[in-house]
Amino acid sequence: MTLLAAVLPSAALPSSVSGIARFGRTQAGELCFCDRDPGAEYAEVAAGSLVLCTDSLAVTLSNRFPGITCLPVPDPRALFIDLGHSLLAAESVAVSDAVPRPFGIHPGTKIGAYTDIHPETRIDEGVHIGAHCVIHRGTWIQAGTIIRDNTTIGVAGINAYRGLDGKVRNFPHFASVIIGPGVEIGAGTVVVRGITTSTQIGAECVIGNLCNIGHGVEIGERVWMSVGTLVGGHTRIHDGATLGMSVAVKDNIEIGAGAQIGMGSVVVKSVKPHASLFGNPARMVGPIHAGPNR
């Protein structure tokens, strides 16, 4: 609240902030930011949401989303980042409630040498974690999942923003990583935790060696992802999709269910269900036989 008080008149200060969330996904009392017109992307924003925004957006947002509280500031994104880091530094801030309590490691878990697991994680029955892995705070690994050597789960990513003051800031990462049952994650892979929404990997997925899964990515069930695949933040990959070796997927797009993307492709637009793509940029081609059924 000290940071808010420094830039807002006392009359505009909220009495309390219950949490931080992404614009469009807030609940009453939660703080978010909006520094550009959201257009038709969001049909509604919960009444009682606290929105850091520019002066020019305040009237537009208030008219479009009745019941929200707009907090006009010169640089909403920068202030949101600063507030987030301030909250993360406070010991009282809880891990995302997406991870069920109690925390703990199931006694039957197999853990390799020199692996570090934060105490505020949940690891279910039958999980096998290899050597030299790091499992960060706020991770939930469900039953029967295998994580191979040198893998990092739940690390904060690098999502930089240069503020109006010229200072470069990195977004704080509040959310979790949720890995479903029966998943296999290859050696040297990095799964970044979400900023405000959890990074999720569905049941029975196979994630190859040396992959990078960005913040807030949502992967459905039985997705097959080969060696060296890169997936940008907030992308959704639906059930049964197959991504070949060294595929790169842009942030904030969707890969439809059952889609197949050939080796080395660069995907910059959303992909329809059951489509086959190949190339840079990826384009529609004839059927590709990839993944476990090739």
Range-by-range predicted roles:
Residues 33, 98-285:
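Structural signal for interior beta-strand "rungs" in well-ordered beta-sheet cores
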Residues 1-102, 108, 144, 150-151, ...:
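Terminal amphipathic alpha-helical/low-complexity segments used for targeting or macromolecular assembly
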